[in-house]
């Protein structure tokens, strides 16, 4: 029994051994099996039965190891086991056996069980002599495994189409955690990540304390979600409490991250967000070597005393940070400048110094002929060496930057009533923030750089574009009257108020009628639970100057002037006949603006004619408001379909122009044209998305005021700084796209006739307008649907009035029809 106890540890090791080496056998095995020697040709004598004697090389422990017995066997069993191995061994005593004549090979458990057991004992002894792996080694292996899992999740995570602008995630180098001058290791090389992995695992550890505290409503009400930021400034309610509770956890985590400056920014994706939120856009460190474009073109190495600079920002993991709009790793920009950005005055004056850090920079690079402008997305962000950057400004005002652009490039306004060459003679007599027919056009006076406009300009979605076709068989059609138009705030007289108008909405809520406004105010007074929904506003539009400098204004004006002169008199006559409905401001009116013009005076049957019962007046007013919202949604859907048709027409005209370019230009120039028109849509979408989110945060800051929750305000300021860094990256990208367009336009001016060149200019202007209108329509439709769903949910939880019946024609999708009053 003692032998069985001592050999228990060797059982699993011996049974798990698949191939054993004869050289590791003990001397007892050599003496007991000396007949296996090649020098001995005599057959081995049979080993007698041991009986009650215990052989030195055969005991109960060995028998248990070989045959897997868990308890001592009987005497008969021992006899049978001692005879079976001998017979097996005798069978191998033949001199012709390869096991004997050749070199020692792997042992077989069935053929030589005792020899197998002895070898297992030697193997177990050798394993026992090896020291166990220390805990530090196991921890390092676990950290490497976790790092590999994070890289797999990062590379296979969901990405929006608007953000996939360059290299895939598996090719983006990681930000260095220690020295910014060291080259970035590839994210796919797991051999050299031993130093970085411990730092990366610290980020999830910090957020572990706050895990599970976020409610579903709090996750959805992020700062970048359209239509939800209007709730931030209100005190009380579950939304404000959740936000304050969420930020208290994030503030603690952010304080811990501030102590370790080498941590990576943790980015998460939200599948419930329409466009996903912003993220930090610091300049990722990239080696100054050769880079390869998406199309396969390889660029030359960076020369001179230029180096790359990395910006690392620690962000709480539970904070709702999305993947960056223009990730620095894929930022394909040349320069980096620091701007303060557009925000309310009190927002920047009171923002804490520790909310964020940015690397100020500096180098403004001119378009270089050595690198093709088609690869604008592929050019690395470079900053000069410290000795070269001394004495340069470190900060630039955003408004000053916009004013410089406006002075340099100028702005134009085109309409059907006035030809384009008459634009310098117009003057502004109304405030640039005044709304006309429910929409507003904002023009920036370039003669007063110090002027600040607190009104937030927006993009008009009331109009659409109808670009002219460019084919070889028929001449170019005159540009439509709704492509470019003067601002409504401009009248003839002054040359300072000129603007390239893309179409804009007023940022303030425009009620369709006085009856609608009175109905909303009355319901907010009668039912405070609906005040938050009724007081909300649709998402703001991007600022006006966001697209300034992207297109050459003067060149577009000169190219389109002949066509506008030809159609000037016809358009002016049409406007004199009262065809103001064809004006761009009224071409794409939202249902709110249409109702406002149609219902400028309340109808008797709508305002005073309907006398609801006193006991059910609140419910009847909700029904009436639901009917109005449903009608507005129907009008917006109709305009959305018409805008889709306009976009399809733009695609057709672009194809006709591409066919003309393919016949007149070389294949390389044709490829340049195709890539530019494809990238133009992505760049415009990114600029509009970034601008609208920046305005949304500014509105939330202005609404919150100085008496709001400090944690809430600090969180908004942190979000604002992230957006400002993204805005700086977007400005640099816009400058590169503008240089790329200039190079392409020079080729087209040399190769294409005048009518095709005019068509190209019209396509550029109309594409920006179509995208801005689509974004505005989608946002307003989503906003009205939220209001309609809230009112419908409130109506479904109240008993029906006997004077209310169902209206089959007015009902939301997948729901029962709304109630309508019996008049």
Curated annotation (Swiss-Prot):
Name this protein carries in UniProt: Protein Shroom1
Family: Belongs to the shroom family.
Organism: Mus musculus (Mouse)
SUBUNIT field: Interacts with F-actin.
Alphabetized GO MF terms: actin filament binding; myosin II binding
Keywords associated with the record: Acetylation, Actin-binding, Cytoplasm, Cytoskeleton, Microtubule, Phosphoprotein
Modified residues (N-acetylmethionine): 1
Modification type Phosphothreonine: residues: 383
Subcellular location field: Cytoplasm, Cytoskeleton
Major localisation: cytoplasm
Residues recorded as bearing Phosphoserine in the entry: 103, 133, 137, 166, 190, 224, 385
Protein's UniProt keywords contain Phosphoprotein: yes
Alphabetized InterPro entries for the sequence: ASD1_dom, ASD2_dom, Shroom_fam
Ranges for domain ASD1: 145-233
GO cellular component, one term: microtubule
């Amino acid at each position: 029994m003692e032998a069985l106890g001592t050999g228990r540890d060797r059982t699993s090791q011996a049974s798990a051994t698949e191939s054993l080496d004869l050289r590791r056998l003990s001397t007892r095995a050599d003496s007991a099996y000396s007949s296996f020697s090649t020098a001995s040709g005599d057959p081995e004598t049979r080993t007698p039965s041991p009986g009650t004697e215990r052989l030195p090389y055969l005991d109960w422990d060995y028998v248990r190891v070989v045959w897997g017995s868990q308890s001592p066997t009987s005497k008969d069993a021992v006899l049978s086991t001692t005879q079976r191995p001998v017979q097996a061994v005798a069978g191998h005593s033949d001199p012709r056996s390869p096991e004997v004549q050749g070199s020692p090979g792997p042992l077989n458990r069935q053929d030589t069980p005792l020899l197998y057991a002895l070898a297992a004992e030697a193997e177990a002894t050798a394993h026992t002599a090896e020291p166990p792996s220390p805990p530090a080694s196991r921890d390092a292996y676990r950290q490497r495994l976790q790092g590999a899992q994070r890289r797999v999740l990062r590379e296979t995570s969901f990405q929006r189409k608007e953000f996939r602008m360059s290299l895939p995630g598996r090719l983006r180098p990681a930000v260095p955690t220690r020295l910014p001058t060291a080259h970035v290791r590839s994210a796919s090389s797991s051999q050299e990540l031993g130093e970085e992995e411990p730092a990366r695992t610290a980020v999830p550890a910090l957020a572990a304390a706050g895990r599970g505290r976020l409610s579903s409503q709090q996750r959805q009400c992020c700062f970048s979600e359209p239509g939800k930021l209007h709730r931030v400034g209100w005190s009380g309610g579950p939304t404000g409490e959740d936000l304050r509770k969420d930020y208290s956890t994030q503030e603690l985590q952010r304080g811990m991250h501030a102590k370790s400056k080498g941590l990576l920014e943790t980015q998460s994706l939200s599948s419930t967000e329409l466009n996903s939120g912003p993220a930090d856009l610091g300049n990722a460190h990239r080696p100054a070597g050769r880079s390869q474009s998406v199309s396969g073109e390889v660029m030359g190495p960076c020369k001179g005393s230029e180096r790359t600079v990395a910006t690392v920002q620690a962000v709480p993991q539970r904070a709702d940070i999305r993947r960056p709009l223009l990730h620095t790793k894929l930022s394909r920009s040349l320069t980096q400048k620091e701007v303060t950005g557009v925000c309310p005055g009190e927002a920047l004056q009171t923002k804490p110094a520790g909310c964020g850090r940015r690397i100020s920079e500096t180098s403004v690079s001119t378009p270089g002929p050595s690198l093709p402008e088609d690869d604008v997305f592929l050019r690395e962000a470079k900053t000069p060496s410290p000795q070269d950057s001394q004495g340069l400004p470190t900060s630039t005002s955003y408004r000053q930057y916009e004013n410089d652009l406006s002075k340099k490039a100028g702005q134009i306004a085109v309409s059907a009533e006035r030809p384009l060459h008459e634009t310098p003679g117009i003057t502004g007599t109304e405030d640039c923030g005044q709304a006309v027919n429910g929409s507003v056009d904002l023009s920036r006076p370039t003669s007063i750089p110090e002027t600040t406009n607190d009104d937030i300009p927006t993009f008009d979605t009331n109009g659409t574009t109808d670009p002219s076709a460019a084919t070889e068989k028929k001449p170019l059609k005159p540009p439509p009257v709704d492509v470019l138009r003067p601002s409504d705030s401009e009248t003839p007289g002054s040359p300072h108020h000129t603007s390239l108008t893309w179409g804009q909405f007023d940022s303030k809520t425009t009620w369709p009628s006085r009856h609608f406004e009175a109905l909303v105010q009355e319901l907010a007074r009668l039912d405070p639970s609906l005040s938050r929904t009724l007081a909300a506003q649709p998402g703001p539009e991007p600022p006006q100057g966001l697209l300034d400098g992207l297109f050459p204004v003067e060149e577009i004006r000169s190219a389109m002037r002949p066509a506008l002169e030809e159609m000037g008199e016809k358009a002016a006559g049409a406007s004199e006949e009262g065809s103001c409905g064809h004006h761009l401001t009224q071409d794409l009116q939202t249902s709110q603006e249409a109702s406002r013009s149609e219902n400028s005076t309340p109808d008797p049957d709508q305002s005073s004619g309907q006398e609801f019962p006193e006991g059910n007046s609140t419910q009847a007013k909700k029904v009436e408001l639901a009917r109005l919202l449903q009608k507005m949604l129907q009008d917006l859907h109709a305009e959305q379909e018409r805008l889709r048709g306009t976009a399809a027409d733009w695609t057709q005209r672009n194809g006709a122009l591409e066919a003309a370019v393919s016949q007149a230009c070389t294949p390389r120039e044709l490829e340049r044209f195709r890539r530019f028109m494809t990238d133009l849509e992505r760049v415009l979408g990114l600029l509009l998305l970034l601008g609208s989110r920046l305005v949304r945060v500014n509105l939330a800051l202005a609404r919150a005021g100085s008496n709001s929750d400090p944690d809430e305000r600090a969180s908004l300021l942190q979000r604002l700084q992230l957006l400002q860094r993204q805005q700086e990256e977007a400005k640099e990208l816009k400058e590169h796209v503008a240089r790329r367009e200039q190079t392409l336009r020079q080729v087209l001016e040399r190769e294409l006739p005048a009518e095709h060149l005019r068509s190209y200019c019209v396509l550029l202007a109309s594409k920006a307008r179509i995208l801005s209108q689509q974004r505005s329509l989608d946002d307003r439709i989503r906003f009205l649907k939220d209001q309609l769903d809230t009112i419908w949910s409130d109506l479904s939880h109240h008993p029906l009035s006997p004077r209310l019946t169902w209206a089959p024609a007015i009902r939301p999708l997948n729901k029962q029809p709304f109630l309508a009053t019996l008049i």
